[in-house]
Amino acid sequence: MITLTPGRLTLPQLRRIARENVQIALDPASFAAIDRGAQAVADIAAKGEPAYGINTGFGRLASTHIPHDQLELLQKNLVLSHAVGVGEPMARPVVRLLMALKLSSLGRGHSGIRRVVMDALVTLFNADVLPLIPVKGSVGASGDLAPLAHMSAVLLGIGDVFIRGERASAAEGLRVAGLAPLTLEAKEGLALLNGTQASTALALDNLFAIEDLYRTALVSGALSVDAAAGSVKPFDARIHELRGHRGQIDAAAAYRSLLDGSAINVSHRDCDKVQDPYSLRCQPQVMGACLDQIRHAAGVLLIEANAVSDNPLIFPDTGEVLSGGNFHAEPVAFAADNLAIAAAEIGALAERRIALLIDATLSGLPPFLVKDGGVNSGFMIAHVTAAALASENKTLAHPASVDSLPTSANQEDHVSMATFAARKLADIAENVANILAIELLAAAQGVDLRAPHATSPALQHAMKTIRADVAHYDLDHYFAPDIAVVARRVRERAFATLSPLSFESEQ
């Protein structure tokens, strides 16, 4: 059980929500603030004075006054008219994150929503009755309206859900969870729809995947150093301390740890090679820069996870209703775009190391890492696949946030495109997972060819993990299953856990 304290969520909590079947509960300490906010909205609605989002239309229709007897219909119509998403359903971890983030935002007490509505969301979450939310349809400003409308429609008994992974109607989902359809009161529909929770959930889910890919790339990169008989001198701490970037310093330390005790390295320590190619030698500099971007994005997304991104905002102590723009997801868009660049670069550097390993002139290994070249092509076309994926990522890494299209009759005339920025991270991450799988196979092949000299104790664990699924490449064979099985192990974090660098303790 994870207790959600609104405004104080942590990254470890969010990782568990995404990856484990943990249940959640709202911190009782938040109840008083929630109740004060709901009462403030009820008081404003009872007075009948115009207040945006409470008794007016929305967007360009904000100047339209809504009679008191139509306020409940207003909220229902808002939810139904905004449920216009298209595309495949959001993944289960993303929906779980989205619901938890929405509860945290509402739980700060500035949205004016009743506890009964929030309790229903908690009940659905814990019953594993998750709204079916189409992944496309948000521009990331005025909040993630369409995705959150699909979440909210389920509370009304409308739409579809997944009940323990099986698709069903929202009405059936409510029945399984022991709930009845809700009637939303003044502002509650808007409070549910306004917010950056969809884009933030997508970004967080992909952040966690990219963190694991980063750790895996440290392992594959270190293994490639030994496969290519590269030097460990470029990882000397003194070099990196002189530059001062934290990520570079930490990355270099990880490479030193992974390569410590390598007999391969000792065997060529006195060779006449002066410098390695950049893809080996500059790993701390490149991967350090990626690490800094990942950490920065994590910090931005954690702030957003704890934010109140509703509009308007209720301030119960003064009775004020303030319209602002906290729903604009530009911080999320920038964080996701920076993550995209970092993730693409992780894959691009790994592709260069694969190219180095298969080049006999650079690596000193048999051409394409296979004996009897000519009749055997070895890793020749596996590298082509890695190159194709790395090239694709260069297009996917183009920033989504540099684009904007006006919506709502130009009332909402600048938008963030954060949801797309966050969504395309999944495609980049999948490509990187496959590139790293190819590198791990190539590096393992190279290390085998360095026998009788062995790699380091830490990297021997990586070798055992690879060889448990894929044998040494002696002769050409149907290669695709080898890549697929190692890529699956990459996604399962089998190699990430071998890295001395961890994100788990970072908040």
Curated annotation (Swiss-Prot):
Cross-link (5-imidazolinone (Ala-Gly)): A141-G143
Cell compartments where the protein resides: Cytoplasm
Catalysed conversion reaction: L-histidine = trans-urocanate + NH4(+)
Assigned keywords, A-Z: Cytoplasm, Histidine metabolism, Lyase
Enzyme class: lyase
Membrane-crossing segments per the record: none
GO molecular function, one term: histidine ammonia-lyase activity
Residues recorded as bearing 2,3-didehydroalanine (Ser) in the entry: S142
NCBIfam families xrefs: hutH, PRK09367.1
Protein name: Histidine ammonia-lyase
Species of the source: Burkholderia pseudomallei (strain K96243)
Lineage summary: Bacteria, Pseudomonadati, Pseudomonadota, Betaproteobacteria, Burkholderiales
Primary gene name: hutH
